[in-house]
Design a protein with these regions (language model features):
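A conserved, well-ordered hydrophobic junction motif at loop->secondary-structure transitions
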Residues: 29-42
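HotDog/MaoC-like acyl-thioester-processing domains
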Residues: 5-20, 75-79, 87-170
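Active-site helix/loop of acyl-thioester processing domains in fatty-acid/polyketide metabolism
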Residues: 39-57
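Short alpha-helix capping/helix-loop boundary micro-motifs
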Residues: 65-68
Length: 170
């Protein structure tokens, strides 16, 4: 007889939202005074992991950064504001969306500079995958992101299968 795992109570999107603020310093930049892309990716990974952890309430590891758009340069002295939102929870993995803005410290204006989607996997102390709670969507925006995350996951799975078949044939 197969054992059935007890259902985990759902958690709301709002419960895992995260925000992080960082001042861009000269050590974070290239010789032109622009923020290094790798440094921005590091911040994106951190704020995404915080949202995933808040949802799963256990250790999480980054499985992929599926898509990242660098929209505009970020300069030394800019204030980075990174916001992450859990888009969807699957069995042991979660998709998190991250948006990055720059607040100009002189006039307070905001500019969208980057966006990314990341997948995190919940694990125990031994690194074994563990189930995550389902995600409870409340707003139309939550529902749209939930649906879009499912579509992106299907596309990623098809792409992985295509690559496996292409590799097996070579």
């Amino acid at each position: 007889m197969e054992s059935v795992e007890p259902a985990l109570p759902p958690r709301k999107v709002a419960d895992s939202r995260s925000e992080m603020t960082e001042l861009v310093l000269p050590n974070d930049a290239n010789t032109l005074g622009n923020l290094l892309g790798g440094r921005l990716m590091h911040h994106i990974d951190l704020v995404g992991a915080i949202a995933a952890y808040r949802h799963a309430r256990t250790h999480v590891v980054t499985a992929s950064m599926d898509h990242i758009d660098f929209i505009a340069p970020v300069h030394v002295g800019d204030l980075l504001i990174l916001k992450s939102t859990l888009n969807r929870a699957f069995r042991t993995s979660m998709e998190v969306g991250v948006k990055v803005w720059v607040e100009h410290t002189v006039d307070g204006t905001m500019r969208h500079v980057a966006s990314a989607y990341l997948t995190f996997v919940a694990v125990d102390r031994q690194g074994r995958r563990v189930r995550v709670p389902p995600l409870e969507t409340e707003t139309e925006e939550d529902k749209r992101r939930y649906h879009d995350a499912g579509r992106r996951r299907e596309q990623s799975q098809h792409e992985r299968e295509r690559k496996l078949h292409a590799h097996a044939g070579s």
